[in-house]
Curated annotation (Swiss-Prot):
Record organism: Shewanella sediminis (strain HAW-EB3)
Any Gene Ontology biological process: translation
NCBIfam families, per database record: L28
Protein name: Large ribosomal subunit protein bL28
Record lineage: Bacteria, Pseudomonadati, Pseudomonadota, Gammaproteobacteria, Alteromonadales
One GO CC term on file: cytosolic large ribosomal subunit
Domain of life of the source: Bacteria
Amino acid sequence: MSRVCQVTGKKPMVGNNRSHAKNSTRRRFLPNLQNHRFWLEGEKRFVKLRISTKGMRIIDKKGIEVVVAELRARGEKV
């Protein structure tokens, strides 16, 4: 399973660890992904999404029905 948010599309970024001596080593910054189950009232069923915490805030703002409709319009299977 890839580390990509289904709502926002957030992916891992690359950057550097910095030691006290300013040495740099490459590292990955991973998005804060959560597996979450949402109830779709219109379909009377649960939907499982792998979303970031930012995606959860978007769902709180817009509503799960609107977000799922946008995902389906993009061609994602939900």
